[in-house]
Amino acid sequence: MRAMPLSIGTIHFVGIAGIGMSGIAEVLHNLGYSVQGSDLSENANVARLRAAGIPVAIGHDAANLGNAQVVVVSTAVPRDNPEVQAARKRMIPVVRRAEMLGELMRLRWSVAIGGTHGKTTTTSLVAAVLEGAGLDPTVINGGIINAYGTNARLGGGDWMVVEADESDGSFLRLPAVIAVVTNMDPEHLDHWGSAEAMEAGYRQFVSNIPFYGFAVLCIDHPGVQRMIPDLSDHRLITYGLSPQADVRAERIMSDRNGATFEVRLSERVAGRERVLAPMRLPMLGNHNVQNALAAIAIGIEMEVPEVDLRAALASFRGVKRRFTKTGEVAGITVIDDYGHHPVEIAAVLRAARQAGARDVIAVVQPHRYTRLATLFEDFCTCMNDAGKVIVADVYPAGEEPIPGIDRDALVEGLRARGHKSVVSLGSPDHLAEMINAMARAGDYVVCLGAGSITNWAQALPNQLQALIETTRRGAGGMR
């Protein structure tokens, strides 16, 4: 396959530390291209890229371009960005992130994973299955894969696994041989305009695969199932918990360390079925069993031996900020999770219940005013598996506030719909005291959101420990 010439010159990434941009930059660098970039602030991704040998400037300034011959931007970068303006003035090509990802994908046979939820975990699981089979895949993911310590991996094999971003429609540019759709829920309607237009985008995503490829679709989701009649000219494999799935999980047994399940394979044309011996997945929640089924379906189609499938799942180490345990203090378990859509929040809280939690305390930081406004009713009804809910201020992610759409509106909305215990968080500084007062041994404290709440989740175990020790010392002094 024909690749971009290494002589193309230095490639400059505006916003290089973004989770989508950093993976592409890292793989290009490892392939031998000259890569540099800029970002607004110091963070873990900046440090990781610098450690890999990629220069990163802090702040956006025309001077950061240096001798760059190509500039890569995401849709989050505004047209008036000084580096973008300087590139256009110098007639340097300005390339969208998805276009550059598409160029990378032309170097390999590619698997693209799309969907509203579960993309990052499914991408990681597919990568684990292909790696376990000795196929040495290249991987570009939307989250940090714990086994790699990064969101990107340059492999020497013929396959690439990528997370496909539907938020701006750019996944339609990706030249995939295998397409996965995990689910479809209303999201990013600022781009799509309507749920119907979004579903049409997913149909096009699947339709773009070549005749020698195939699509893997989660039949459990009504929106995904609705697509099937329109895709009858393509090779389709369905998966899920439904009896109608080609690759189906049965006899799911959950414990605090994960799930064990059998897999029933159905060949619709031949009319045959077979059941694989039980699989073990060290992740909580039926939604993660569904994610694993997508990887199993791809592995079966690619003739990965069953023993390798089983080993890959059993040894899977997860993804950062996907039900990540940050600590346990006095029997209280603290979880950090990226979930910020009502469907994700409900699935994560259900998983905490499946883990055997005595009670579940949800700490929720709504992400973006527009999302809270668009999905307000869903936010008000997605937390029933939490015995107690603490609601923080909205993380704006650059948005302006919307009157009547804020922390207090969500608190009142939850109460009005019958939730028995909902309180607001005045400041992150008060979180540890609130948790110390309401949590007991055996409880799970689940911190949910795509914003700064991850920092609170990381700090909370030590803060709780300090409060407990202070209380003990005080009690000892009174004797």
Curated annotation (Swiss-Prot):
Pathway: Cell wall biogenesis; peptidoglycan biosynthesis
GO BP, one annotated term: peptidoglycan biosynthetic process
Family annotation (Pfam families): Mur_ligase, Mur_ligase_C, Mur_ligase_M
GO CC terms, sorted: cytoplasm
Binding sites annotated in the UniProt record for ATP: G115, T116, H117, G118, K119, T120, T121
Disulfide bonds: none
InterPro entries: Mur-like_cat_sf, Mur_ligase_C, Mur_ligase_C_dom_sf, Mur_ligase_cen, Mur_ligase_N, MurCDEF_pg_biosynth, UDP-N-AcMur_Ala_ligase_MurC
Top EC class for this record: ligase
E.C. no: 6.3.2.8
Entry's localization field: Cytoplasm
UniProt entry keywords in alphabetical sequence: ATP-binding, Cell cycle, Cell division, Cell shape, Cell wall biogenesis/degradation, Cytoplasm, Ligase, Nucleotide-binding, Peptidoglycan synthesis
Gene Ontology MF annotations: ATP binding; UDP-N-acetylmuramate-L-alanine ligase activity
Catalyses which reaction(s): UDP-N-acetyl-alpha-D-muramate + L-alanine + ATP = UDP-N-acetyl-alpha-D-muramoyl-L-alanine + ADP + phosphate + H(+)
Family, similarity comment: Belongs to the MurCDEF family.
Purpose of the protein: Cell wall formation.
The name this protein goes by in its record: UDP-N-acetylmuramate--L-alanine ligase
Species annotation: Acidiphilium cryptum (strain JF-5)
